[in-house]
A protein has these predicted regions:
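Secondary-structure transition motif
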Residues: 1-186
């Protein structure tokens, strides 16, 4: 069974993954406690090294990609019919607008988990903050697709981002996280 992973769209993190600008993600550990040793903790992580995971997106965005792909390559029927059939089948489902309800097997884009480590949230390095999608421009750092407030260091921008995509206070509480590195497969 294929698993899926969700990224925050409000801050364009799904897009950042698809463009190769985000190659790392942190997920809170359940119960915020590592299980004593690495082997025990690793058994309970959501994703394993080498695992291929689908990138969650809504059926509507999958349909839009199909139409864009057909237009770009000047495809005509039966591919246009396939897109229309897809739309008819899924546009009245919960997954049309909400990627949480989309079947992982239908998702067209995937990542491969290349590394995982367990650490406190604030142990993130400057380099890893950049891999989380923080953008560098000139001598400043910014949240993904938001150039309204510059930060001096990538970690500073990441601290703000994590409180926006999670809940306010996540950075300050410094929870245990699984830090997954990944590469885009398709």
């Amino acid at each position: 069974m294929t698993k899926k992973i969700l990224f925050n769209d409000k801050y364009s993190l799904t897009q950042e993954v698809r463009y190769g600008n985000k190659t790392m993600t942190r997920r809170l550990l359940r119960d915020n406690v590592p299980l004593g040793n690495w082997e025990e903790t690793a058994k309970h992580l959501s994703y394993k090294v080498g695992e291929v995971v689908a990138i969650a997106q809504s059926y509507k965005s999958i349909y839009a990609e199909m139409i864009e792909d057909f237009a770009k390559h000047n495809y005509h029927t039966p591919r246009e019919d396939a897109a229309e059939n897809f739309r008819k089948e899924y546009e009245n489902t919960a997954g049309w607008n909400n990627k949480m309800f989309v079947k992982a097997a239908l998702l067209p884009h995937h990542i491969r988990i290349t590394d995982v480590k367990v650490e406190r949230l604030q142990e993130i390095s400057e380099e890893d903050a950049l891999r989380e999608g923080i953008e560098e421009f000139c001598f400043d750092y910014f949240l993904p697709n938001d150039y309204s407030k510059p930060f001096l260091m990538p970690r500073d921008a990441f601290a703000v981002l994590i409180d926006k995509v999670g809940k306010k206070g996540d950075w300050e509480s410094n929870p245990w996280v699984a830090a997954y590195s990944f590469e885009l497969v398709d």
